[in-house]
Amino acid sequence: MIIQIIGLPGSGKTTLATALADRINAVHLNADYVRATINSDLGFTPEDRVEHARRLGEMAKMLSSQGLDVVVDFICPTAATRAAFGKPNICIWMDTITEGRFEDTNKLWETPTEFDYHFVSYDSKGQTDLIIAQSELHDWKAPTTLLLGRYQPWHEGHHALLEKAYERTEQVVIAVRDTHGTSEKDPLPYQEVANRIRAEERSSFVVKFPNITNIVYGRDVGYKIEQVELSQELQSISATQKRKELGL
């Protein structure tokens, strides 16, 4: 997931990016910081602005390909720089001011034609809430149920457990224990397990966990640990048989 926030200098891009990245546990790439460090060899010619955008886009794609959500705040003033950056999953235009502090950027600025959110005022909290709700992003501060397992492979019994988990909270995290190769019962690497789950459970939030074997907690820690009883038919599902059927 790549979320790009564009707009003139001083329009509130970084403020919103900081708030949003914190709520969805994303990597935050600030274009000013990247320009001052990694891209310090670039100036402000049209060609260098396009190259700056291209490099930022490649950085965001690299991080996203590793399973990380990325929020990029970046002026991205022209159609050429936006094309060089690439199409994000979500584009947010902060249209809160008519002029920024840099005259050359004001002259370069071209009104965006493609965006998912268009904000004309400052309200990072309300805007973050709106983006998370409408784009169905996972809010790391919302009450969440944890569903922990190996899922070698994901099957009907796991789906039933997921439905029970959603009865507890509106948001569920499916945590996949990284047990690949630890036994003959664990032939699937994490990414294949995750892909299979996402194919079956379209809105699922799947994360990689260590090979958790024990859970220890203190008194009255603010959460519940419970075993969910499923029907005898679902409990009788054999993961070993499922693996045989799938040729694993």
Ranges and model annotations:
Residues I2-Q4, L146:
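Short hydrophobic/aromatic beta-strand immediately N-terminal to the Walker A/P-loop
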Residues I3, L29, I90-I92, Y117-V120, ...:
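Hydrophobic/aromatic beta-strand patches that form the interior of the parallel beta-sheet core
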Residues T14-K61:
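Conserved substrate/cofactor phosphate-moiety recognition/catalytic segment
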Residues S11:
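ATP-binding Walker
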Residues M94-H138:
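Small-molecule kinase domains that catalyze NTP-dependent phosphoryl transfer to phosphate-bearing small molecules
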Residues L8:
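P-loop (Walker A) phosphate-binding loop of NTP-binding proteins
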Residues T45-E99:
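Glycine-rich phosphate-binding loop used to anchor ATP phosphates in small-molecule kinases
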Residues E136-L248:
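Nucleotidyltransferase catalytic core that binds NTPs
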